[in-house]
């Protein structure tokens, strides 16, 4: 049985989606909302996303908070210190989560996109993620560990 692709979404993708629902980021968020893509989150990544979104008017946390479904929460510890190749300590949390659950990290951050081989995770932009034919391939998603 095929499962929806499993992803971790970086904060900048949520911000882009909230500003332009017709963007690649907006389409990706809609895939999550419709169950075509499974978004895994951690308390730390949710806190960062919420803090950033709430600081940027006119976007609204209420427009994305429903995507943080309890059944998709990864509640084990993550180790951002293993990802010191990423300059921004806040971005390391997203890389650590993607690594811990075997998910694709979707980001528009050049620091994350520029070093996936050193992170040992797949990092894609929303456009790159949407251009892959996940639903027709043999790829079946990665269950949470």
Tell where the protein language model's regions lie, with residue ranges.
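Small, basic N-terminal interaction modules of short regulatory proteins
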Residues: 1-6, 126
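A secondary-structure boundary/capping signal
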Residues: 10-11, 42, 108-109, 125
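Hydrophobic/aromatic ligand-binding patch that stacks against planar heteroaromatic rings
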Residues: 31, 97, 115
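Acidic catalytic patch
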Residues: 43-44, 62-85
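Acidic, PIN/NYN-like endoribonuclease modules and their adjacent C-terminal/linker elements
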Residues: 84-88, 92, 110-145
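Acidic, metal-associated active-site segment
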Residues: 88-105
């Amino acid at each position: 049985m095929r499962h929806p692709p499993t992803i971790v979404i970086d904060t900048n993708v949520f911000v882009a989606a909230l500003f332009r629902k017709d963007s690649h980021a907006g389409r990706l968020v809609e895939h999550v909302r419709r169950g075509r893509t499974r978004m895994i989150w951690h308390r730390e990544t949710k806190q960062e996303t919420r803090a950033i979104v709430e600081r940027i008017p006119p976007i609204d946390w209420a427009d994305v908070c429903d995507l943080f479904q309890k059944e998709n929460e990864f509640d084990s510890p993550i180790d951002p210190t293993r990802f010191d190749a990423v300059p921004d300590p806040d971005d390391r949390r997203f890389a650590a989560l993607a690594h811990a659950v075997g998910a694709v990290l979707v980001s528009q951050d050049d620091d994350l996109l520029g070093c996936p081989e050193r992170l040992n995770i797949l990092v894609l932009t929303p456009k790159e993620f949407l251009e892959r034919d996940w639903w027709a391939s043999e790829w079946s998603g990665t269950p949470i560990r």
